[in-house]
Regions:
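Long, C-terminal-biased catalytic regions of enzyme "large/alpha" subunits
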Residues: 1-145
Length: 145
């Protein structure tokens, strides 16, 4: 099934699919109805870019969460390249062999031992690198703000 079984990963929850182009507010509104059915273990995530310079937008989303949904968090990217000192989002690219690899957009570093990357996967913030399936899922995530 195109877009479902042709991925190297699966999802198993009520969350809007990571590739869905949807606003933070619409995503939270949609997912909130399922949290009412699962109060013992329910959370929604909003993918956001670096929001350091847009605190009013963060507050707006946080207020919406407070007013409308049981439990939600913001996922942001905060990576660091130890080779050149780049502080931002390390990119996922496809190398010449078709493998997904992490690359510093500033200096091209691909040595995972010389970069710090943190992403939320399966509910936890991890700093180790992931298998190809999970890396594909991370790459396909769209931003909600």
């Amino acid at each position: 099934i195109p877009g479902v079984t042709d991925k190297n990963y699966i999802t198993n929850s009520y969350h809007v699919h990571v590739t869905e182009n949807i606003s933070a507010f619409d995503k939270l509104k949609f997912e909130s109805q399922f949290q009412e059915l699962s109060p013992g273990g329910a959370i929604s995530y909003v993918e956001v870019p670096d929001m350091e310079n847009n605190i009013p937008a963060v507050i707006s989303v946080m207020q919406y969460i407070y007013d409308n949904i049981m439990y939600a968090e913001l996922n942001t990217k905060s990576d660091y390249c130890q080779v050149c000192g780049y502080n931002g989002q390390i990119q996922i690219i496809t190398d010449d062999d078709g493998k997904l690899v992490w690359e510093c957009p500033n200096c091209g570093n691909r040595d995972q031992d010389k970069m710090n990357v943190a992403r939320r996967t399966c509910g936890y913030i991890g700093t180790q690198f992931w298998n190809q399936g999970r890396t594909q899922e991370i790459k396909e995530r769209v931003l909600h703000l």
